[in-house]
Amino acid sequence: MRELVNFDSGERLRLSVEDKALVSVSQKGGKTKQSKKEFASIDEAKKACVKKEWESLKKGFILQDSEAKTGEASLHVYIGGGYTGALSFASIKDEIYVYKSGGQKDGGKPSDILVKLDRSGAIKEQIALPKPLAWDAQCANENLLLDLDHEIYIFEPKEAKFREILAEQNVKKSSEIASFICSANNAAVFGMFGQIFIFCEGLILKIGEYKCSTKNHVPILCAALSADASMLALCTKENELQILNAKNGEILSELRAEFGVLDKICFLDENTLLLRQYLENKLFCLDIKSAKMTKQPWIKDEYLRASEFCAEAGKLVVIDQSRAYAINLKSGNVMAEFTLDHVVKCCEAKFIDGKLAVRTDYGCFSLYKI
């Protein structure tokens, strides 16, 4: 059942379009109210329904749909504070932490927060961040790693505390400002100020260093961990990638191909990387053993521009602004093609318990059935 729920007031709201009318059914305190508003056409009624749903989300209602089909949202929560480029979130057990840009408080101090949700979408807590701008958030071993304006912090939910890794590891700030975090299999590898660390079983170990080339004054840096966290793919130069042993930083191979500048990579399996070209947003596959590069084979759209993508357990989702494609990597078939709600230009996406989780630039956090 698709309904809007307000956990604070206890109100439940169901919206539907019947013929050319918007029908609202509200339940609160054992009482039911129904209203019906006629429109000139079905399309106008549908637009009014979408508008009413969005207005309700902004008032604190949460959309839940227990009967969502493939490509449909099972959850919408209005977070607000969307900042293009910093739409980070991550999940730990039954909790989801979503970054919210809070602008400025009185006195000019930043008020950026982590919004903690449970799986029903209820907001359980709002946690003040020690620094603004959470560019990325990843989970490892029940901890949250945060890239806060290019400095890495670890948030420990059980202790409700932030660990400042810069101070812990005595990392000296340098001109190497580009940073990264990637996680898999309860481990994480992160880099800041030219130094690479692994975080595993609560311990932090330095495993290497990096130096970024630049393209149009922008540092080249992206990284990915293999599913078993044994390999780190690292790109710091145009047309060049390194595969490192993620445990000790040993260079396993150096790959050179005409892929240009990359801004996102991920492992599809232990032998294949998915690459996104900087600015062009085109996707390519790279064979790690042969360094052979091929165009993505799944989506038959020469105009495809991948604003976002994510892969997990044999599934890949590619997003072009608000258009999403879910792909079965084993068969190579597109399982579903659907439109994401509440996206203006971009979003961040990850898999959470088999569902597609999306944080949009319009201020929403959603789960979609895949």
Where are these regions (language model features)?
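Short, solvent-exposed loop/turn segments at conserved positions within beta-propeller repeat blades
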Residues: 104-111, 190-191, 236-237, 278-279, ...
